[in-house]
Regions:
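Active-site-proximal alpha-helix that buttresses catalytic centers in soluble enzyme cores
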Residues: 2-224
Length: 224
């Protein structure tokens, strides 16, 4: 017998006509506060993922618990504090990653309209991906498009998001219809959006001056 909230009796909106589609924008995640304890909790979940660190747990766990989680949280918390958005606990304060992810979700909701439910989820931390998928199922959203917010595919980024969604499905008696996007780095619309954002920034702040040593720097999050 399974034990998730969508099991047992049919979920609301179980009829085909009431099944509202949903889009889930999945990002990596963030500590809920810039403190050592919250950073430690986030790092433990993140660095315990076999997609992120492929070393066998028997070898990796002692290193993680005895060294990394004793040393890294305090230093990382201090760095998080320098970029943390001030204010009360709202979607506009706190982690920049959370703020801009939620804003992206709001803008997509405006674009798609009320016929589609748009939610933001995090692979690590909150709002947890499996929790968000469960809430959508309870709301009658049985067709879910899952979009990992990583243009290029990597097992440790987009791959682990799909893993987590699969774990939700494996534990669910009432399963959703799920579609995922592997990557979109070559999509013309994505490239055009980057170019448009860059052009708008230049119009507001001026173009780089090569003679003054100014350059346009493109930064990518690398993996081993």
């Amino acid at each position: 017998m399974t034990d998730d909230r969508t099991n047992g009796a049919p979920a609301p909106g179980d009829g085909h006509g009431a099944r509202r589609p949903a889009v889930v924008l999945a990002n990596l995640g963030t500590p809920s506060a810039p403190t050592p304890s919250h950073v430690r909790r986030f790092l433990r979940e993140f660095l315990s993922d076999r997609r992120v660190v492929e070393t066998h747990p028997l070898l990796w766990r002692p290193v993680l618990e005895a060294i990394i989680l004793r040393v890294r949280p305090r230093a990382s918390a201090a760095k998080y504090a320098t970029i943390w958005r001030p204010g009360e606990e709202t979607s506009r304060s706190g982690s920049p990653l959370m703020h801009y992810s939620q804003r992206q979700g709001e803008l997509l909701q405006e674009e798609l309209g009320e016929s589609v439910q748009v939610r933001v989820a995090m692979r690590y931390g909150q709002p947890a991906l499996r929790r968000v998928m469960g809430e959508l199922m309870e709301a009658g959203c049985h067709r879910i498009a899952l979009i990992p917010l990583y243009p290029q595919y990597a097992a440790s980024s987009a791959g682990t998001v799909v893993d987590e969604a699969a774990r939700f499905i494996l534990a669910s008696r009432n399963q959703p219809e799920l579609r995922t996007i592997r990557s979109f780095e070559t999509a013309p619309a994505y490239i055009e959006a980057l170019a448009t954002a860059l052009e708008q920034h230049w119009q507001s702040h001026g173009r780089p001056d090569p003679a003054a040593g100014e350059r346009l720097l493109l930064s990518f999050h690398s993996i081993p």
